[in-house]
């Protein structure tokens, strides 16, 4: 099965705004031209098929595909369908249980643990957020820790699910170490993402999805390929010294960079505290690496954390709806510098989603080939 490089026979560079591929750090025309447009229904079907062929049961394959397509639709390409090949590798290798028997245990009115049984993290995280939302509608606020899990993709997928259920939702996960501490000379924290979603009447949800590192690792890999220098203060060499040479990068710097990285390091620590320490899961620096390893057999025993808050149990839904509508209207109307525009968290992603509904989802050719969809 083949597809044209872009709508109406035009090239990708002629039809795709460069920011649509922003998460991969893609900024040059040659790199943008190295993608193909794929219709979402076909991309979904092929991704599901790849996971099933690797042995994943329906719940595992469905949740992973749902989370990957969330990322691909919203322009978070590093966590989109490009991860399908990695997930099939760990399913076949034995690191991930293809047929997990997840179990949850409610320990209080607003607290629970969910055992992912070493399955892919997507199904566990969706289940944890669903459980947290249900408990929050009773208790007002509820947290669910996930244990014995694996990589769950884009944290925003689960915050969005909670927001679409009408609650304020927070999701996070610690990951294997790739980020130095502020002033540190070795990897200690993962990129440790934090996502927050909130419902907005008659609008898309307010949606924050961010890593606690200065830049994503994919940005380093891209700049290495392009031979471009990195911005100052975002990465370090093997001795922990800041470097702008992507070939010398051994670790990332925390959010805030050389001068203010203590803020990002503390945020990463908060994610570790809630995802790993609170749940008894593996600490970042003790975790088997997602990649950069030959071990695709040993479970990584990752932890996640999901929190849900029901606005009905605080000031009430009517006041919440009025306040968040006014807040966002005033935010978007706030004065901007010349040539700039003001956006709320999620605005850029919703614009990407709308564009990709029109053009199809751009996928790198290697991933398209893996899914049997390359031109």
Per-region residue spans from a language model:
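N-terminal glycine-rich anion-binding loops that anchor highly charged ligand groups
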Residues: 36-40, 56-82, 96-107, 297-301
């Amino acid at each position: 099965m083949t597809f044209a490089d872009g709508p109406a026979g035009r090239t990708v560079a002629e039809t795709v705004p460069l920011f649509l591929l922003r998460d991969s750090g893609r900024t040059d025309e040659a790199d943008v031209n190295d993608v193909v447009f794929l219709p979402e229904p076909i991309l979904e079907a092929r991704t599901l098929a790849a996971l099933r062929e690797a042995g994943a049961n329906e719940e595992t394959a469905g949740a992973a595909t749902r989370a990957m397509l969330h990322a691909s639709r919203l322009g978070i390409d590093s966590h989109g369908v490009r991860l399908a090949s990695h997930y099939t590798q760990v399913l076949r290798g034995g690191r991930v249980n293809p047929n997990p028997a997840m179990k949850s245990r409610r320990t209080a009115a607003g607290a629970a643990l969910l055992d992912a049984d070493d399955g892919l993290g997507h199904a566990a995280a969706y289940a944890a957020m669903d459980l947290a939302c249900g408990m929050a509608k009773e208790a007002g606020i509820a947290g669910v820790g996930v244990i014995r899990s694996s990589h769950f993709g884009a944290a925003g997928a689960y915050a969005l699910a909670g927001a679409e259920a009408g609650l304020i939702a927070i999701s996070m996960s610690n990951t294997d170490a790739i980020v130095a501490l502020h002033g540190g000379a070795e990897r200690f924290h993962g990129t440790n993402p934090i996502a927050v979603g909130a419902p907005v009447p008659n609008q898309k949800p307010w949606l924050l999805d961010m890593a606690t590192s200065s830049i994503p690792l994919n940005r380093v890999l891209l700049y290495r390929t392009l031979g471009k220098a990195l911005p100052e203060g975002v990465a370090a060499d093997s001795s922990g010294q800041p470097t702008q040479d992507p070939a010398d990068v051994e670790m990332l710097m925390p959010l805030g960079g050389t001068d203010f990285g203590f803020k990002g390091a503390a945020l990463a620590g908060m994610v570790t505290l809630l995802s790993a320490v609170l749940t008894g899961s593996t600490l970042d620096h003790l975790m088997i690496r997602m990649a950069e390893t030959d071990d695709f057999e040993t479970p990584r025993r990752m932890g996640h954390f999901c929190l849900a808050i029901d606005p009905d149990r605080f000031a009430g839904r009517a006041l919440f709806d009025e306040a968040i509508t006014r807040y966002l209207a005033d935010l978007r109307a706030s004065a901007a510098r010349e040539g700039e525009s003001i956006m709320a968290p999620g605005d850029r992603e919703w614009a990407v989603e709308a564009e990709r509904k029109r053009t199809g989802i751009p996928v790198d050719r290697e991933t398209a080939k893996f899914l049997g969809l390359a031109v």
